[in-house]
Amino acid sequence: VYLPHFKRCIEEGAASVMGAYNKVYGEQASESKYLLKDILRDKWGFEGFTLSDFLWAVKDGPKAVKSGMNVEMPCICHYAEQIPKAIEDGTLAMEDVDEAVGYILRTVLYYETRKDPQEYTEDILACPEHIAVAKRAAEESMVLLKNENHVLPLDKEKTEKIVVLGVLGDTENIGDHGSSKVHPYYTVTPFKGLMKKMPKAQILYNDGSDLEHAKELAADADAVVIVAGYIHSDEGEYLADRSDIAGMGGDRASMRLHQRDIDLIHGVKGVNPNTVVSIIGSSAILIDEWEKDVPAIIFSFYSGMEGGNVLADILFGDVCPSGKLPYTVALSEDSYPDFDPDCTYAEYEYYHGYCKMDKENIPVLYPFGYGLSYTTFDISEPTVEVFDKTAKISVNVKNTGDVKGAEVVQLYIGCEGSAVDRPVK
């Protein structure tokens, strides 16, 4: 469940791998021989170098080196303090250090000889191939959660006036500004994406701060798109003990939308039957308090440089949504583990996420793997071929609707009557 997507990155030639902060099987991930050597090196054949996540991923420097962690980031805190003494007293072999240095030098020399320019111009960043990848990523990830009375897709011939509401409706919003920050050559906002999609229509933008005015605009439009959610200062990298940046980034203070977004949705509810809410965020957002007030909801996540264009394509049916929820949208905060945005240590038990909710029969609003489409599919009964250590499970998928689309085939496995405590699926 957790390793295949990392394995695919290695198979595609990833040159470095970062260890995480969390523990796996009781060990720090950045000090785990099982992860860093047994799986990454021996099983997958990785030949690049490994580095730790920043500041707190490594606790025991010598153990990390022996386990296959080559570089401590962002400074050599534990390595500088602990490694010389460990070599001196014989608890760390010089061969382990040499091995780590070897992986680093080999990777650096390989890329140095390729003369990578390091600075990338528009013809590289915004080349047709990169734009196509950005569009595909957004197209396949957006999730259509609700489409009451088939509000979507909107009719191009009948849509002459669209109102985009919300602070994020015309904000270039691609997510975290920490180590995962990217610098695309351009970013298309929802408002600009709709303007490009419908050049002959009247497209209006309003941040929604004046609820009465927003309501008037919504009532007079053929369709309303409310863009709600988060930006990097709401959820991103954050140091819990840094008072000078308290309140910026890190874990969200709430699992719900900002009150301004909730007020906007409540404020315009009922005035336009063609209202769509596009939600931007990285993980589960509770929507139960307003979900019934709007006919259509799309989880857009942080959809990258082409996000606004893709949202417009989905709204007007040029792209058929096929994304599925990578988490469960619960009915309340009580369905999740205790939540403390300022904690420096948290322990999650074996069951969390959708596995916990399944195990405890907790009702949810939208389950893990949920996502609507503009078409319908028929999936045949599976056929199973059992081999020595593997099994091949096959199904036939048929598009039974009138719209070209794609379906994500999901396979869940359970162990009924198992003597070992296991997830339901």
Model regions and ranges:
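Second-shell residues forming the walls of enzyme active-site clefts
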Residues: 1-96, 103
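C-terminal non-catalytic regions of proteins with extracellular/luminal or membrane-system context
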Residues: 3-4, 26-29, 45, 51-54, ...
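Proline-centered turn/helix-capping motifs that create local helix->coil transitions or kinks
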Residues: 10, 108-116, 324, 362
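A short alpha-helix capping/helix-coil boundary motif
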Residues: 15-18, 40-41, 61-63, 117-118, ...
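Conserved, charged catalytic cores of large soluble enzymes
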Residues: 81, 95-102, 106-124
